[in-house]
């Protein structure tokens, strides 16, 4: 097992549902974890599919919560958005954009292929300084509360297995293959360098 804990990042589009659910579970299990979004704005469901609530990444979860409470308490209570924001504000103050973070991670988990592509593109556009590898793995998770919870447990199990490998670089492909067979999901995986 590695002597130092894995530095993990979980990334979805708006740093609201999927990445925050995984952040919550991983931090409770003792992982060094941060979560991010890759979008240009934070989008939350609105009164209609074509009317999302759009916020800047600088907006706190508390401000979003109060804004939606004011707009339509019943709707946002019923669809679970207020509950989700309440959880989020207990984890960290506001959503963060992956592209603005210069921290180094051992493992970056993304929640959909488009986000995976954006993370890989961002990492590859940075100037390589240390040549330290970072494994980027995509676990497709539908953006709803139930799937976010199931996906978070899968991500957590995956991180625990990777944490317990003797040699992550040589064992990760085999480990991912086992996870694909067990979960019935396919994972994208690549290595980038810092």
Curated annotation (Swiss-Prot):
Biological process, per Gene Ontology: mRNA processing; termination of RNA polymerase II transcription
Record field: catalytic activity: O-phospho-L-seryl-[protein] + H2O = L-seryl-[protein] + phosphate; O-phospho-L-threonyl-[protein] + H2O = L-threonyl-[protein] + phosphate
Major location (coarse): nucleus
EC number(s) reported in the record: 3.1.3.16
UniProt feature coiled coil, ranges: 160-186
UniProt keyword list: Coiled coil, Cytoplasm, Hydrolase, mRNA processing, Nucleus, Protein phosphatase
Gene Ontology CC annotations of this record: cytoplasm; mRNA cleavage and polyadenylation specificity factor complex
InterPro entries reported for this sequence: RNA_pol_II_suA
Top-tier EC class: hydrolase
UniProt-recorded Gene Ontology molecular function terms: RNA polymerase II CTD heptapeptide repeat phosphatase activity
Keyword Coiled coil carried by entry: yes
Entry keyword annotation includes Iron-sulfur: no
Function statement: May be involved in the C-terminal domain of RNA polymerase II dephosphorylation, RNA processing and termination.
Family: Belongs to the SSU72 phosphatase family.
Protein name (Swiss-Prot/TrEMBL): RNA polymerase II subunit A C-terminal domain phosphatase SSU72
Lineage: Eukaryota, Metazoa, Chordata, Craniata, Vertebrata
